[in-house]
């Protein structure tokens, strides 16, 4: 991968700073929020590129522990002094404008880069497959990675979750192929120089950034048209170059799933392929090559008896169709596609089984948008006729405000709902959008099976007293608190039920 030979001068914007770093070769890159799932991957990439990297975060976590083991210095807590030796300061949209390090960087004329800018620089000259969408990005990227791993493509992979096969959110590859999960929440995907742009789904999330749903659709349209080669659901309503794209779905897509069978921890299905290129792309010594823009539609070429391991729910089939579409575009063989999906090990916190205690399954899922929570609930219903209890950590007051009625409607589909505090804890409350407001709305609509809890011991007692074999308890949310509650609760229940 050529980035290994890059110097730090390739990763900055300022010409003045370029000269300074070129002379010293000792420029330090400071990453604010380095423990985040995306920022920690950037830190690893830069570290493996022989750049001197450091960073800071409000608290330690597993990502930070891993970075520290690599020799990367991490400051716990934000302080202006943390960036005193840095020449470049990198931040994401999650960092508030009043962050003391960000302010200090600007006041001291440091080069300040957004995450998207440094990613764009890192990927220049690479063969980039970028996966974006309102939901399903992480799982789809992980499935593509698994197919690559079983087809000779040694790609660098960065993803917004911990892949069970890598035990990491990052894998350094040995080729120029770069597979990345591209964040749509702040328009980052528009700066990624993708050869193939993948859209998993589009919904009206992140309205606070985009303003309108039309703006969201226009951004995704720009994303795929920038790439010139696209993979997208057959249901999306955006403008794109249809001549150089593959659509996937269950009814009208060029790549369609049929004969879907849900098993205990896998899904079996067939795929009809109506997209056959005039010139199949191929791999030359493990390197991706560009697909011809010309394609013809011939008779369906079925791919039979695909087994997707570690997957529950129809939405996982949709993710797999996107991954299969990318593989078909690259000319990967049917056998390698099937092998990659059969060996798929899943992603942490994506319908992940934490414990099965005397027939009661405790499952963790990252869902935080109403559509995602509904998909998670539907997946649970597909494997049990018993009760499904949701322990739910809402993500941000603004999202509660934007989707309040949708949350109420979907929460009422559970047998019981326990609400935990809104994540992140520093999020500014919005009147009428707290968990107590959600509970009141549920009760006023006739749904009385709801509590507010934030203590693993209390939750464990409730689950022990209220569940029986074949019941499922879903820990739902994107924050760190719900993940901690899930692990602690599982341990406590195991002690009680032994």
Swiss-Prot record:
Listed A to Z, the keywords are: ATP-binding, Cell cycle, Cell division, Cell shape, Cell wall biogenesis/degradation, Cytoplasm, Ligase, Nucleotide-binding, Peptidoglycan synthesis
State its Enzyme Commission number(s): 6.3.2.8
Record GO terms (molecular function): ATP binding; UDP-N-acetylmuramate-L-alanine ligase activity
GO BP: any one term: regulation of cell shape
What is its pathway? Cell wall biogenesis; peptidoglycan biosynthesis
Q: Which reaction is recorded as catalysed by this protein?
A: UDP-N-acetyl-alpha-D-muramate + L-alanine + ATP = UDP-N-acetyl-alpha-D-muramoyl-L-alanine + ADP + phosphate + H(+)
SUPFAM superfamilies, sorted: MurCD N-terminal domain, MurD-like peptide ligases, catalytic domain, MurD-like peptide ligases, peptide-binding domain
One GO cellular-component annotation of the UniProt record comes to: cytoplasm
- Residues given in the record as ATP binding sites: 133-139
Tell me if Magnesium is a UniProt keyword of this record. Answer: no
- InterPro entries from the UniProt entry: Mur-like_cat_sf (IPR036565), Mur_ligase_C (IPR004101), Mur_ligase_C_dom_sf (IPR036615), Mur_ligase_cen (IPR013221), Mur_ligase_N (IPR000713), MurCDEF_pg_biosynth (IPR050061), UDP-N-AcMur_Ala_ligase_MurC (IPR005758)
Query: Is the keyword Electron transport assigned to this protein?
Result: no
Q: What HAMAP family does this protein map onto?
A: MurC
Family in the record: Belongs to the MurCDEF family.
Q: What is this protein called?
A: UDP-N-acetylmuramate--L-alanine ligase
Q: Which organism is it from?
A: Wolbachia pipientis wMel
Lineage, broadest ranks? Bacteria, Pseudomonadati, Pseudomonadota, Alphaproteobacteria, Rickettsiales
């Amino acid at each position: 991968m050529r980035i290994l030979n890059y110097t730090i001068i390739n990763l900055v914007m300022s010409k003045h700073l370029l000269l300074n770093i070129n002379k010293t070769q000792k420029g330090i890159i400071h990453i604010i929020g380095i423990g985040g799932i995306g920022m920690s991957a950037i830190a690893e990439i830069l570290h493996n590129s022989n750049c001197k990297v450091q960073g800071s975060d409000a608290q330690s976590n597993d990502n930070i522990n891993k970075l520290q083991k690599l020799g990367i210095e991490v400051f716990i807590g934000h302080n202006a002094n943390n960036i005193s030796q840095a020449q470049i300061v990198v931040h994401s949209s999650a960092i508030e404008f009043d962050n003391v390090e960000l302010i200090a960087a600007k006041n001291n004329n440091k080069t300040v880069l957004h995450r998207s800018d440094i990613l764009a620089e890192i990927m220049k000259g690479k063969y980039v497959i970028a996966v974006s969408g309102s939901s399903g990005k992480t799982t789809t990227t992980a499935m593509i990675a698994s197919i690559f791993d079983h087809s000779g493509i040694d790609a660098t992979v960065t993803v917004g979750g911990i892949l069970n096969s890598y035990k990491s959110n990052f894998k350094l590859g040995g080729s120029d192929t770069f597979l990345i999960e591209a964040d749509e929440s702040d328009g980052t995907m528009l700066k990624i120089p993708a050869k193939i742009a993948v859209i998993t789904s589009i919904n009206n999330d992140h309205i606070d950034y985009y303003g309108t749903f039309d703006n969201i659709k226009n951004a995704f349209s720009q994303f795929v048209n920038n790439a010139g080669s696209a993979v997208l659901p057959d249901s999306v309503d955006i403008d794109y170059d249809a001549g150089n794209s593959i659509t996937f779905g269950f009814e009208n897509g060029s790549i369609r799933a049929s004969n879907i069978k849900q098993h205990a921890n896998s899904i079996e299905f067939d795929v009809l392929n109506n997209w056959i290129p005039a010139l199949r792309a191929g791999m030359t010594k493990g390197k991706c090559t560009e697909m011809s823009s010309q394609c013809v539609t011939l008779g369906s070429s079925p791919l039979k008896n695909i087994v997707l391991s570690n997957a529950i729910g129809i939405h996982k089939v949709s993710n797999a169709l996107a991954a299969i579409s990318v593989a078909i575009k690259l000319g990967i063989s049917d056998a390698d596609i099937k092998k990659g999906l059969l060996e798929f090990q899943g992603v942490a916190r994506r319908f992940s089984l934490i414990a099965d205690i005397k027939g009661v399954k405790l499952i963790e899922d990252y869902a935080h948008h109403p559509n995602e929570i509904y998909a998670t609930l539907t997946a649970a219903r597909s494997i049990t006729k018993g009760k499904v209890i949701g322990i739910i950590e809402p993500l941000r007051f603004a999202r509660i405000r934007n989707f309040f009625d949708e949350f109420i409607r979907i929460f009422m589909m559970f047998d019981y709902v326990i609400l935990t505090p809104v994540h992140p804890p520093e999020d500014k409350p919005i009147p009428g959008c707290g968990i107590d407001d959600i509970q009141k709305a549920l009760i006023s609509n006739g749904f009385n099976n709801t509590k507010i809890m934030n203590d693993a011991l209390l939750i464990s007692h409730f689950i022990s007293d209220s569940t029986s074999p074949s019941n499922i308890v879903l820990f739902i949310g994107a924050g760190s608190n719900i993940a901690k509650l899930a692990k602690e609760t599982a341990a406590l229940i195991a002690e009680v039920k032994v």
